[in-house]
C-alpha cells in the first residue's frame, strides 16, 4: 500500500480532507493531511509562501516520511512544487488535482484571471490582517457548483480567511522545471471545475501541459468534489498514484 500526503488549497485546512482520507484508509493506504502554515481559524496569518512550504517540509521530516505520493489541490500545487525542489528524495510521485503549476517566476496571482486579481487585492486591502475571505456567491457558483445549497452552506462555514502574501510571492521554480521529468507525475482534472473559467484561464490543459506529459486522470465534479463525492475522488487519487 502507499503513503499519501494530501496538501489542501486556499481557505481550507487538512481537516477538510476527512472524507477522502477515510476512503483511502479503508482501501489500506496510509494518509497524512497536514495543515499549511497560516491556514485555519484563530491562527497567525502573517506568513509568506516560504513559510507555507517550510511547514509541510517540517511535517514530512518530523514524521520521517519517505516514498510518499504528494498531492496538491489548487493553491497546494504551488506548495508541492517547492517541496519537490527541497526534498525530492522523499517523494515517489507528485499529483496535482485541479492545482496550480506556476510558470517559472510567476506568483499565484499571475496565474489567475484579472477579475480574481482585482477581487483578491480589494479583499486583502479591506481586511485588517492582509487576508482574503471567500465570498459565498463565488463559493456557491464557481467552487462547489456540483453540490446543493445545503452542502454549499455546510461547507462554507468550514472555510477560513486566506493569507494574501503567499498569493503574490514570486516562485522561480528553476529546480522544479529542471527535474520534473525525472519523477512520476499525474494531473487529476475534475471536469465541472469552473473555479478557474474554462478556456484561456482554465486548469486543463493550461496547467497540466507544464508537467511534460503527466498521467491524466479525469472525473466528473467541481473544484470541491472532495465534499460532494469523496469516494470517487479517492478512487481517482489511487489511479493517479499507481506505479
Predicted features by range, described:
Residues 85, 91, 95-136, 166-169:
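Flexible "cap/lid" loop of the alpha/beta hydrolase fold
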Residues 227-241:
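Post-His helix in hydrolase/transferase enzymes
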Residues 2-41:
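Conserved HGGG/HGGXW glycine-rich cap/lid loop of the alpha/beta-hydrolase fold
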Residues 72-76, 80:
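Gly/Ala-rich beta-loop-alpha elbow adjacent to hydrolase catalytic centers
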Residues 161-226:
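Conserved serine/cysteine hydrolase catalytic core
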Residues 129-182:
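Conserved alpha/beta-hydrolase catalytic His-Asp/Glu region
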Residues 36-69, 85-86, 108-114:
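Active-site loop/oxyanion-hole signature of alpha/beta-hydrolase fold enzymes
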Amino acid at each position: 500500500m502507499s503513503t499519501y500526503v494530501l496538501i489542501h488549497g486556499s481557505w481550507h485546512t487538512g481537516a477538510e480532507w476527512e472524507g477522502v482520507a477515510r476512503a483511502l484508509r479503508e482501501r489500506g493506504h496510509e494518509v497524512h493531511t497536514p495543515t499549511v502554515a497560516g491556514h485555519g481559524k484563530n491562527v497567525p496569518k502573517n506568513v509568506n509562501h516560504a513559510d507555507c512550504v517550510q511547514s509541510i517540509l517540517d511535517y514530512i521530516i518530523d514524521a520521517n516520511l519517505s516514498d510518499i505520493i504528494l498531492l496538491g489541490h489548487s493553491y497546494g500545487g504551488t506548495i508541492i512544487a517547492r517541496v519537490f525542489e527541497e526534498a525530492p528524495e522523499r517523494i515517489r510521485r507528485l499529483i496535482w488535482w485541479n492545482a496550480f503549476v506556476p510558470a517559472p517566476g510567476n506568483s499565484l496571482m499571475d496565474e489567475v484571471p484579472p477579475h480574481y486579481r482585482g477581487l483578491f487585492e480589494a479583499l486583502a486591502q479591506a481586511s485588517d490582517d492582509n487576508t482574503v475571505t471567500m465570498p459565498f456567491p463565488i463559493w456557491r457558483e464557481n467552487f462547489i457548483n456540483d453540490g446543493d445549497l445545503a452542502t454549499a452552506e455546510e461547507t462554507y462555514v468550514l472555510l477560513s480567511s486566506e493569507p494574501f502574501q503567499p498569493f503574490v510571492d514570486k516562485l522561480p521554480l528553476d529546480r522544479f522545471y529542471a527535474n520534473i521529468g525525472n519523477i512520476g507525475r499525474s494531473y487529476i482534472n475534475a471536469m465541472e471545475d469552473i473555479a478557474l473559467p474554462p478556456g484561456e484561464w482554465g486548469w486543463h490543459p493550461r496547467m497540466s501541459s507544464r508537467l511534460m506529459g503527466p498521467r491524466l486522470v479525469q472525473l466528473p465534479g467541481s473544484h470541491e468534489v472532495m465534499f460532494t463525492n469523496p469516494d470517487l475522488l479517492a478512487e481517482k487519487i489511487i489511479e493517479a498514484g499507481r506505479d
